Amino acid sequence: MYEKLEQLLNDLKSMNLKPFIGYGNPDAKILIVGKECTAPNGSDGWKKFYEPNFNQWKKSFEGHGFDFKSGVEPHDFEHGNFHPINPYYKLENKKQSKKKEVGRPSATYYYYQRLVDMIRTGNDVEYKKSDCIDFFKDCFITELNDICRPNDSGLNKPEHEKIEESIRVRFDWMRKTNFFNQFKVVILACGPYAEAIKKDEILRTELYGNASIVYCHQLSYWDKSLENEIPKIQESLAKK
């Protein structure tokens, strides 16, 4: 089970790296790539959700297993309640308002769910909306930039250069491993961060193999262009 993910962890360990791998089903056919985690480095959210991600996966293979359940209390992070294969289970499929209601997803996860529901059942008019956030069972999600921040607005030149270097480092180890090139569909929901991938076919193939690539902006709000991509995505997923 999840042999390619286990091999990725071993390869990264041999490189002395413990990056954020991602969340979701490691054997899924869909990969969604966001920009970066929004919890600032060193914050409580970063310490609970982002920084331990490598070790959470590693411990799963070392005996913890891959079971998950609904947390007894909101934000219950004990292993088995919070698990990277299906984190934050079980969230209601209603977007958080400015009040940040517990038990509801962020805007980004809400729109990830809409996208996956559309892929599963039809188009933006006819798709069936899931009752809870369950897109993780049909996709794996990760980030392109390992520097966590709420957004990338107002950054100065040195900060932009740090982001570019972070992405280059991720590209480097991705080239040397064989996990992220296994997916049939890769949705690059990271806007301008994906420009180098869009322009360079060799880089694109090195990172994502022969996957069908879809580009859109970061999904903290809906991207209407995705509605035209649904038939293409469904066709790619149907291929053997």
What is each stretch, according to the model?
Residues M1-L12, S97-K98, N156-N178, P192-K240:
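C-terminal capping/extension of enzyme domains
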Residues M1-N181:
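A polyanion-binding, active-site-adjacent surface
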Residues E36-P40, N145-R149, G191-A196, Q218-W222:
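Short, solvent-exposed loop/turn segments at secondary-structure junctions
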Residues V185:
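Short, Asp-centered acidic motifs that coordinate Mg2+ and/or phosphate
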Residues L188:
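Redox-cofactor binding/interface segments in oxidoreductases and associated redox assembly factors
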